A protein has these predicted regions:
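Membrane-anchoring alpha-helices and their flanking helix-loop junctions
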Residues: 1-63, 77-149
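Short, amphipathic, aromatic/basic-enriched membrane-interface segments that mark the entry/exit
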Residues: 62-73
């Protein structure tokens, strides 16, 4: 995906993007960077730093921070990143990348949520009952704000 995204960005018609819509372009770049930063944070800095994931055993489910917002917040930031890139480039290729990559990510987390995490994360069944799958709710937003790690 990274190579495809890089290729799409390199082939985008950059000469007209900034001159025609400078504010929209700046907001799109800011949105893409914001979503990318949140994606990196949720994927790499939201888990315990001990060797729990390397031991091959069952680890506790993370239920604080962004993981109180929904069970798979990375999907939100991933989709937001590609949506911002589409808004920036305004190309049909980036629209297709947004749609296909996001659909693949959703399929991946459905499989994780149904088959992998219930077996590898302790307390995941309870977490599924209290936290929305993908779409945050006002209740989950309040929970996220209360449960900062």
């Amino acid at each position: 995906m990274a190579a495809a995204t890089g290729s799409l960005l390199l082939r985008a018609p950059w000469s007209g993007i900034f001159s025609a819509h400078p504010l929209a372009s700046a907001l799109s770049i800011a949105g893409a960077l914001f979503c990318l930063a949140l994606l990196v944070k949720v994927l790499f800095f939201s888990f315990p730093t001990d060797n729990a994931y390397l031991a091959g055993g069952v680890s506790p489910a993370v239920t604080t921070g962004q993981y109180a917002l929904c069970r798979h917040p990375g999907v939100l930031w991933f989709a937001g990143f590609y949506l911002a890139l589409f808004a920036l480039t305004r190309t049909s290729q980036m629209l297709w990348a947004f749609l296909l990559f996001t659909a693949a990510d959703v399929l991946y987390v459905v499989l994780q949520d149904r088959y992998v995490f219930p077996k590898t994360l302790s307390g995941y069944a309870d977490y599924q009952k209290t936290t929305p799958f993908l779409i945050p709710t006002p209740t989950s937003l309040r929970a996220m704000l209360r449960k900062q790690p």
